[in-house]
């Protein structure tokens, strides 16, 4: 007798710098899908992608979820398959809806979304276009600019222009003519603050450019601003909904990777204490930003807000936001009256719309 439960394939890990974050997010998502509330709705098949991009079946995936760490060599069957995707693991044929819990390149950038699209199967989150545009900060910012959405001044740098001392100095001089210190140097295609540097002077700018260039050919350099960091969650496909607005507070100089994912290094204010009308503006901008880049399913839209100037800037969109214990996306929906268990259920249902 066929099962009445929907079979959900949760894909996690991935060949990116955010592999460990993906594992932590997957633990939360799988736990919520297998909760007492959802147990009669969903059957979960976990699939693990190792750091070389190889896809592994449920046996390996469950071990990784249990240990909360990347797979050890002895856990992977030999001989090892070639690097990268070769075929879907055993058991995948039963999957009805795919749930990618992948952060960074090869998971959040439209590549795995393209695979699911070719397979003709529904999946959680944005499609190829929305994922690709939102992942690449330069493409995303160009779309925001074309739509007239507010953002801080920024400039693009190509890693090919940093190959020798004279070129590097020329790039730095050009940036200094356009931006003031401090500024932030970012790889265009990484998330979770991986590879980002804050530059207060020419030397730090050059170091930051080299660091970003080691991770990505496309580099963004943004004007630093004195601002609060606010976030809004978006859910839905045909009709997008927004959560309350939350604020990230931290003692560090800026919201880097360690601050983002370490216990007691930051705290949240949900809802964020904001002047009348500001939350409504941010929620409206969040919807406009998602529509601008064709993002749907789920997204977290990040903002900068300067109260003294009453100015709001779009920072970025994350189409596969984290689901760790420190992640804002599920917390924002919890504060908006949607439990974690109901949230993952809605995401799976939305995938089939």
Swiss-Prot record:
Coiled coil: none annotated. Belongs to the D-alanine--D-alanine ligase family. It comes from the Bacteria. Mg(2+) 2 binds at residues 316, 318. One of its GO terms (biological process) is cell wall organization. It catalyses: 2 D-alanine + ATP = D-alanyl-D-alanine + ADP + phosphate + H(+). Signal peptide: none annotated. Its cofactor is Mg(2+); Mn(2+). One of its GO terms (molecular function) is D-alanine-D-alanine ligase activity. The keyword Cell wall biogenesis/degradation applies. Pfam families: Dala_Dala_lig_C, Dala_Dala_lig_N. Pathway: Cell wall biogenesis; peptidoglycan biosynthesis. The gene is ddl. Cell wall formation. Keywords: ATP-binding, Cell shape, Cell wall biogenesis/degradation, Cytoplasm, Ligase, Magnesium, Manganese, Metal-binding, Nucleotide-binding, Peptidoglycan synthesis. Mg(2+) 1 binds at residues 302, 316. GO terms for cellular component: cytosol. SUPFAM superfamilies: Glutathione synthetase ATP-binding domain-like, PreATP-grasp domain. This is D-alanine--D-alanine ligase. Binds 2 magnesium or manganese ions per subunit. InterPro entries: ATP-grasp, ATP_grasp_subdomain_1, D-Ala_lig_Van_CS, D_ala_D_ala, Dala_Dala_lig_C, Dala_Dala_lig_N, PreATP-grasp_dom_sf. ATP binds at residues 176-231. It is found in: Cytoplasm. Its EC number is 6.3.2.4. Residues 141-349 form the ATP-grasp domain.
